[in-house]
Amino acid sequence: MLKGTFFCVDAHTCGNPVRLVTSGHPDLKGRTMSEKRQDFLAQYDWIRKALMFEPRGHDMMSGAFLYPPCSDNADAAILFIETSGCLPMCGHGTIGTITAALESGLLTPKMPGQLTIDVPAGQIKVQYQQTGAKVDWVKIFNVPAYLAHKDVVLDIPGLGPLKIDVSYGGNYYAIVDPQANFPGLRHWSAGDILRWSPIVREVAHRELNCVHPDDPTVNGVSHVLWTGDTISEGSNGANAVFYGDKAIDRSPCGTGTSARLAQLYSRGELKVGDEYTHESIIGSQFVGRIEAATKVGAFDAIMPSIKGWARITGHNAITVDDNDPYAFGFQVV
């Protein structure tokens, strides 16, 4: 029996894929996108798996559904999907979704050049520049970001002691700067990152309490951000973000950049008004900026922004037929 056909706009944000699903998204229960996210995970996670996992997706695939706004002041709402689940917030996903939606005529802003978007992590403001039919760039004013844990030494089996910070930028990140047991991003292979990241995340998740003060459904270390030397002109720092089971973000990562800004602000290395050009593992760049200081519960926090670009790569119609033994996807590792 046919389960559904999903029309999609495929794109990438600075090298990382975004699949905007334009039809077939379910009617979700809940007043907020946080509540709708929980309903999607409970009732419709087969859609995510079918569209993100092989054979219709791949290890790096991420995507989004565009929904009507939950708030009176918003233009739209976004539900993020990827191989690891439904993230509360996704920076590269927002940039790609907004670009694809505007260029495809799926989103009409109340005020050209500006958008207000409801996401599971809260509400974000967006600015963009469009020349003719093409969106040149998108700037996200993200949810508040803060440093949750500082200078925590974890014992990583097989690697040894590793000092990390944990910072929130829409998701919780274990941030690893160069040190004795990590010589820096450019001195490790992608295989090294894929090998050690799940172990670091598991230990950090087990030993550190990470629960968002305003939304307890947002909890636990989900990403690992490794830092190192830059390769692109104009970059202030470089990172490789691990997420899911075996994915390394090809973009500089929007929520990761937000988390990095919060970490550097907490350490006194950045101040309000500073920009920070953040580089990905492939050398693509986001421009992060600390817009303002704020609070998240008892934590000192920042209001970060991230500016980047995306390009549409194609359009497709994906059929999910439960007569197919791989209708709901698979993962090899």
Swiss-Prot record:
Keywords associated with the record: Isomerase
InterPro entries in the record: Pro_racemase_fam
Annotated substrate binding sites: 91-92, 223, 249, 254-255
Enzyme class: isomerase
Catalytically driven reaction(s): trans-4-hydroxy-L-proline = cis-4-hydroxy-D-proline
EC number: 5.1.1.8
Residues annotated as the enzyme's active site: 90, 253
Keyword Nucleotide-binding: no
Origin superkingdom: Bacteria
Pfam families in the record: Pro_racemase (PF05544)
Molecular function as annotated in GO: 4-hydroxyproline epimerase activity
PANTHER family tied to this protein: BIFUNCTIONAL TRANS-3-HYDROXY-L-PROLINE DEHYDRATASE_2-EPIMERASE, TRANS-3-HYDROXY-L-PROLINE DEHYDRATASE
Family the UniProt entry places it in: Belongs to the proline racemase family.
Functional description taken from the UniProt entry: Catalyzes the epimerization of trans-4-hydroxy-L-proline (t4LHyp) to cis-4-hydroxy-D-proline (c4DHyp). Is likely involved in a degradation pathway that converts t4LHyp to alpha-ketoglutarate. Displays no proline racemase activity.
Name recorded for this polypeptide: 4-hydroxyproline 2-epimerase
Lineage: Bacteria, Pseudomonadati, Pseudomonadota, Gammaproteobacteria, Alteromonadales
